[in-house]
């Protein structure tokens, strides 16, 4: 009973420490000074080593415009371009929507760039999104979370990752030992 109490106290302390570290927020950085285009929604997050992002941009669009969503990393070799936008036109005007989920990325990804261009023009960065890290409870992505926390010096994420992983191992061992002990006496 005492080890369980000690583990519970340590879990509360680690989770409080993890919550005291500020997490990255969704950031919208407008770089085109124009009243013609507006970002209405811009969200991105990491979950299970995958990148999810969705958003909406409205303005004076024509079919010649297109929005490109790119993933920016610390290394230039990881500069990826992801295209999943959809052009819409209704009574409120023209807008672009993107909803890209489950894109596998390395732990070095820093930002999602949203660029706006025409078919003949150079793309201009219009907005950016800094992904939030959403913790999961699977051991498949433990390595990704450990690398990300060490790269960012995010001690809260490191402690949460280790705590969740160790807790899942303890539960697995207790279940395995309990099942094998029950089977032995049946």
UniProtKB/Swiss-Prot annotation:
Belongs to the cytomegalovirus US2 family. Retains, but does not degrade MHC class I heterodimers in the endoplasmic reticulum during the immediate-early period of virus infection, thereby impairing their transport and maturation. Forms a complex with beta-2-microglobulin-associated class I heavy chains, which accumulate in the ER. In consequence, infected cells are masked for immune recognition by cytotoxic T-lymphocytes. Monomer. Glycans are attached at residue 60. Keywords: Disulfide bond, Early protein, Glycoprotein, Host endoplasmic reticulum, Host membrane, Host-virus interaction, Immunoglobulin domain, Lectin, Mannose-binding, Membrane, Signal, Transmembrane, Transmembrane helix, Viral immunoevasion. The chain crosses the membrane at residues 161-181. It is found in: Host endoplasmic reticulum membrane. It comes from Human cytomegalovirus (strain Merlin). It is a single-pass type I membrane protein. Residues 1-20 form the signal peptide. GO terms for molecular function: D-mannose binding. One of its GO terms (cellular component) is membrane. The signal sequence is not cleaved. This is Membrane glycoprotein US3. Disulfide bonds join 44-129. The gene is US3. InterPro entries: Herpes_US2/US3 (IPR009237), Ig_E-set (IPR014756). It comes from the Viruses. Residues 182-186 are cytoplasmic. Residues 21-160 are lumenal. The keyword Glycoprotein applies.
